[in-house]
Amino acid sequence: MPQDASTQGRYPDATVHAVLDALTRAAPRPWLIGLSGLQGSGKSTLAAQLVELAARRGIVALALSIDDFYFGRGARQRLAREVHPLLATRGVPGTHDVELLHGTLDALRQATTRRPARVPRFDKGLDTRIAPSRWRPVGRMPELVILEGWCIGVPPQDAAALATPVNRLERHEDRDASWRNWVNAQLARHYAPLWQRLDRLIMLQAPAYSVVARWRDEQERALRRRHAPRALSTEALRRFLMHYERLSRQALKALPSRADLRIVLDEERRVRRLAKRRQAIG
């Protein structure tokens, strides 16, 4: 039986080897890899495993999370006052410092021991980015950079698709559709150029949006068992996920035809198959 990445804590070794093989055997070798997957799909886990395996093969790799480029609470509160109250919640396009992310990628390309790049880190417990003096220094250009996040590679929606609310959050708290239109505009204006920098896009493909709530609830229950201060209750999690439902559904619809490599998951997060565009590879 295939391993379950959620309960075993790791993706199967065969999957990780196959993914890294697909990346490193390409000519020319890609540098910036996008790793996209819905919440709870195991993006950070897979990114870390790819970096570990690359190191064993003598390849210098680095994982970045788009979460580390969130605006802090103060900046988002300004957005909430000036644009829409729902922007107080981090996560949707428009709540990341995309300029900082571009700058970090540029710095990594030029990193040396004398002029190291510095990788930001966001403290979710404090809801702010840690001080630059504590950012991770990188003293040489990585051979492979993996950028992971829930919205990586997701294209904006057509204007007509924004008219109808997808859940009660949009129905009651975004009655005039101004929040979702603003988020969509950010995706088109500021995130699309970032996606264009990707040399390859990998998708952790969930079977349906309906599994996201259970996957994330499993993670939150694990946090509650450890008495983590930021663990969400089931009801709080349900509301939280509504912020991302629209673009999560857009990802499931749009990314399968855009991804260079899909890791197809079942409802238990087990890997069913790996597929390149129109071609199975595992």
Predicted regions located by residue number:
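Residue-level preference for the first positions of well-ordered beta-strands
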Residues: 30-34, 60, 144-146
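Phosphate-binding/switch loop-helix module in NTP-utilizing enzymes
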Residues: 104-154
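Conserved lysine of the Walker
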Residues: 43
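Conserved nucleotide-sensing/catalytic segment adjacent to the nucleotide-binding pocket
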Residues: 62-63, 69-126
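Hydrophobic positions on the alpha1 helix immediately C-terminal to the Walker A/P-loop
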Residues: 46, 50
